Structures are given as structure tokens and as C-alpha cells.
Amino acid sequence: MSIHPQLNKNGELQHLLTTEGLPVTILRHILDTAESFTGVTERDVKKIPLLRGKSVFNLFFEPSTRTRTTFEIAAKRLSADVINLSMAVSSQTKGETLLDTVNNLSAMHADMFVVRHNQSGAAHLIARHVGPEIHVINAGDGWHAHPTQALLDMFTIRRYKQDFHTLRVAIIGDILHSRVARSQIHALTTLGVPEIRVIAPKTLLPARVERLGVHVYHNMTQGLKDVDVLMMLRLQHERMESAHLPSTEEYFKYYGLTPGKLLLARSDAIVMHPGPMNRGVEIDSEVADGSQSVILPQVGFGIAVRMAVMSILAGN
């Protein structure tokens, strides 16, 4: 278990805050449960009653398209009542604290909070202060974590590669500002991936990133050699407080994934991206739309994975 406990006294998942320290049994249970939900999308009636009568509040303090939409779809397919709050026009803009906002919503008999916030630790703070009947899902907090994105990435890898124990995985791009990268590394390690590489210029890597058990490369030619899975990341300009790169054109020249660079990886390698993509910056359109790209299926799997997380938290 991590330093931010996510489990109740019975060892069951109470909140999903981070992939760090998440037991492998629970991680696999989420992936297996998600597998059972993939068929729901293909039905004429795309609903099952596992969360009927439950209220799910989406609290997004940062802009989001894929994450907020897939959480909403997932909750509705489980028959939950979904309340989407525009935090940009909420009482927070009038000076109300985060915990006061949550306490007021809890008084409205919320069952689950899905929280995205620009401050690291926001979801953990909420989880520590809500009652035991309420569950909190971290939908991304600052630079810290984005556990459901990492879980849907693991689901995607398992769908296409089956066995984690034989894989060589490369995460390429802005590792420094990426909560996704941190969550991916923890999940990949827990699932037994023997070699995780990070490829980025020195200015886009966290200090002492090697302590996470990854191999560091500053060169795509060496870093992509014989890789099975390529996980691309965008440049997070909104989190950059100073100049980390000379230009996006130069970044694309050295770190953008082109058809030529993709040839360095294994011939059956898959290309992933959590979105939003910046074509011509971290990835060439020919690769993004090519036969080795699994970027669109990756988005679709997010619904089943988020259904699984909410269902398990609700005790199903």
C-alpha cells in the first residue's frame, strides 16, 4: 500500500488515488473486470444496473475532454445519476475552499467524487476528509498522478501484447510535467514489465528519475531499439514555467515519432498516446493514423476501465 492509503480495513479498494503501491491483485482485478464490461458497448441497450440509485459528481477544476466524457459515459452505463459541475463558475471562484465545496456536496448525499485538479494531492485531501460511504477517484492531480489513464493504458497493452513479463516499453516526451508517465511507470512495474525506458531531453526529465527503476535515454535511435510498446506524451506547455526547449520544430526533429524512427522499434510494436495529440510536435500524422497506432482503441477502452473502477469501489 502507498503512503496515501486507498484500501479499507478489509483490504478492499476504498478510493483510487494513485497506481503507486496499488497491489497487483487489485490492479489485475480492475483489468479483468474491465474486460467483462467491454461487451456492454456493443449491446443495443448499453446499460447495466450496478450503480442504479448512486450519485457520481464529476469535479473538474481543469479542462478535459476524453477523461470527463468517458467518466460520464461509464457512470451512465452503470445506471448512476451523474452530476457534472463546472468548477470555473462554482463557489470556489467566490472564495470557498475545496473542502467546503466537497462538504456541501457530501451533504447532498454524493456517493462518489471524480476529481481533476491542478494541485498535486487534491484528491488525496478530499479522500481523507469524506465519510466512509463516499469514494474518491483521482482523475488527475497536478504533476502527481492519473491512475485511470495508466489503467486504461495497461488494459490496452494487455489487449495487444498479452504478457507484460516479456515487454520492453518506452515512454517518450515530456516526462517532467506528466502525471500520466508517473502513473504508467508504477503500473508497468507492478505488472512485471522487465524493461521500462524513458526517452526525453534532459530538461524534460525529473531529477533522479532512475530511482523509479527506468532506463534513461536522450536519443531516439538508441532508446527505441527493439521496443514493443511506444507511449508518446505531449509537451505540456501550460505547466512549463520557463523555457525547456528551443522550439517545437527542433523538438520534433529529435523526439517526434516519424515513420523512420518507428522502424527502430520491433516490427509489431504498438504506438499509444493519452491525448490530446499535437501532430507534428511529438508524433507524425502518418504514425498517429498508421497500422501500428492503437490510439483510438485506447480511448474506447477508457470507458470499460472507468466502469470497472466505479463498480469495484461501489462494492460490486
Swiss-Prot record:
SUPFAM superfamilies attached here? Aspartate/ornithine carbamoyltransferase
The biological process GO terms on file are: 'de novo' pyrimidine nucleobase biosynthetic process; 'de novo' UMP biosynthetic process; amino acid metabolic process
Source organism superkingdom: Bacteria
Q: Does the keyword Transferase apply?
A: yes
Task: Tell me the residue numbers annotated for binding carbamoyl phosphate.
Answer: R66, T67, R116, H146, Q149, G275, P276
User: For binding L-aspartate, which residues are annotated in this chain's numbering?
Assistant: K94, R179, R234
Any idea of its EC number? 2.1.3.2
Q: Where are the transmembrane segments?
A: none
Under Gene Ontology molecular function, one entry of this record is: aspartate carbamoyltransferase activity
Its GO CC terms are: cytosol
- One Pfam annotation reads OTCace_N
What reaction does this catalyse?
Answer: carbamoyl phosphate + L-aspartate = N-carbamoyl-L-aspartate + phosphate + H(+)
| Main enzyme class | transferase
The subunit field of the Swiss-Prot or TrEMBL record says: Heterododecamer (2C3:3R2) of six catalytic PyrB chains organized as two trimers (C3), and six regulatory PyrI chains organized as three dimers (R2).
Q: Which family does it belong to?
A: Belongs to the aspartate/ornithine carbamoyltransferase superfamily. ATCase family.
The protein's job, in short, is: Catalyzes the condensation of carbamoyl phosphate and aspartate to form carbamoyl aspartate and inorganic phosphate, the committed step in the de novo pyrimidine nucleotide biosynthesis pathway.
Q: What is this protein called?
A: Aspartate carbamoyltransferase catalytic subunit
Q: Lineage in the entry? A: Bacteria, Pseudomonadati, Pseudomonadota, Betaproteobacteria, Nitrosomonadales
